[in-house]
């Protein structure tokens, strides 16, 4: 885990799994991988404000929910929180959790090896580790923009690492059994995402675009915000781009070729 600006926190709402966009796709992935038990002990590694735990809570009302992050949430109403510094050992006993989830977090980690070791330690034998991580390394649009500015996505997305799919699978398989992998952010989705965040560096329009994305106007990830988002031109473009990327990812979700997003379900043996 690593710190990021408070404006990147999108609240304690649950993402809508019925929406035909990329956040909805991630939400459905989580729900599909939940254990059958009605009262699992669940840890969110990099919990933020708890939107994915909220989703778990809606599906498993009896679950006990805990979250860790480098920054305290504004209002953890329905989960127990532990503040943990980056690369600090998790404050839990070995073989504790039935399920660990982590969405869009490992790319921010200072040391993915240590992060995965700790997740493996606190997960009970037979427990599941479920989440999503970008795989922006290797050839593709992200590599092109990194040729122009090696730190472009560290500056605009707070991504400390650009993993390849092979690297991620190596990290996973050395600790866990891979149960299921699916893929997203393929050719069109990756290009749109890479261009969008690279645009933050443009001299005139870039700062305005970045303020929109990180500021209070950005309702894109909120559960019922599609109409509010479309009221601005930029918001409409973001909505359109996500819809296009969603349909591409849905069509190619079993195809790793060109994919820059990995949805994973792992178990501890």
Q: Language model features by range: what are they?
A:
Residues 1-93, 99-103, 116, 145-147, ...:
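Conserved N-terminal segment of class I S-adenosyl-L-methionine
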Residues 3-21, 113-118, 128-267:
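S-adenosyl-L-methionine-dependent methyltransferase catalytic module, highlighting the catalytic core
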Residues 73, 108, 136-139:
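Active-site loop signature of alpha/beta-hydrolase-fold enzymes
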Residues 91-93, 110, 164:
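GHKL-family ATP-binding catalytic core of two-component histidine kinases
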Residues 103-106, 132:
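Residues lining the SAM
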Residues 109-110, 123-125:
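Helix-to-beta-strand junctions that scaffold the AdoMet/dcAdoMet cofactor pocket
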């Amino acid at each position: 885990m690593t710190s990021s600006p408070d404006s990147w926190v999108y609240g304690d709402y649950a993402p809508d799994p019925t929406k035909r966009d990329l956040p909805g796709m991630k939400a459905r992935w989580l729900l599909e991988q939940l254990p059958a038990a009605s009262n699992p002990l669940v840890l969110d590694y990099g919990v933020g404000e708890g939107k994915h735990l909220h989703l778990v809570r809606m599906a498993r009302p009896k679950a006990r929910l805990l979250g860790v992050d480098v920054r305290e949430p504004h209002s953890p109403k329905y989960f127990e929180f532990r503040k943990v510094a980056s690369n600090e050992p998790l404050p839990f006993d070995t073989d504790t959790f039935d399920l660990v989830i982590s969405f869009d977090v490992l790319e921010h980690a200072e040391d993915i090896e240590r992060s995965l070791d700790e997740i493996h330690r606190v997960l009970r034998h037979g427990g599941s580790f479920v989440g999503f991580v970008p795989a922006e390394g290797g050839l593709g649009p992200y590599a092109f923009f990194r040729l122009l500015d090696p730190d472009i996505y560290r500056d605009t997305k707070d991504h400390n690492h650009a993993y390849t799919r092979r690297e991620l699978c190596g990290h996973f398989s050395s600790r866990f059994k891979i149960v299921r992998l699916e893929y997203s952010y393929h050719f069109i989705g990756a290009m749109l995402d890479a261009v969008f965040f690279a645009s933050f560096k443009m001299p005139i329009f870039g700062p305005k675009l970045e303020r929109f994305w990180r500021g209070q106007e950005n309702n894109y990830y909120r559960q019922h915000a599609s109409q509010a988002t479309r009221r601005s031109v930029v918001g409409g473009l973001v909505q359109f781009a996500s819809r296009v990327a969603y349909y591409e990812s849905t069509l190619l979700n079993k195809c790793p070729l060109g994919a820059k997003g990995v949805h994973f379900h792992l178990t501890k043996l």
